[in-house]
Amino acid sequence: MANIKSAKKRAVQSEKRRQHNASQRSMMRTFIKKTYAAVATGDKAVAQAAFVEMQKVVDRMASKGLIHANKAANHKSKLAAQIKKLA
């Protein structure tokens, strides 16, 4: 454990950030899973609505640096292609 006051403060801040980031990452994954589930139902309207919500969340996480921009693009393009296939 840290002995210097500033190091203790940094440890506390780091733990707080870790917990917040974990929460945000979990929320993002939930939106992605909901979108995959909506695509699996085969209803294009529902899937499209879920995709729009997921896209907002993924873009926000990428802009904040929680995930890489390319990872966000991969999620969006993969799901967009699946939604496009739906009749």
Curated annotation (Swiss-Prot):
Span list, region Disordered: 1-27
Ribosomal protein as UniProt keyword: yes
Domain of life from the UniProt record: Bacteria
Compositionally biased spans, kind Basic residues: 1-11
Cellular compartments per GO CC: cytosol; small ribosomal subunit
Record field: transmembrane: none
Purpose: Binds directly to 16S ribosomal RNA.
Family, similarity comment: Belongs to the bacterial ribosomal protein bS20 family.
Keyword annotations of the record: Ribonucleoprotein, Ribosomal protein, RNA-binding, rRNA-binding
Molecular function terms, GO-annotated: small ribosomal subunit rRNA binding; structural constituent of ribosome
Name of this protein: Small ribosomal subunit protein bS20
Gene: rpsT
InterPro entries according to UniProt: Ribosomal_bS20, Ribosomal_bS20_sf
Organism, as annotated: Histophilus somni (strain 2336)
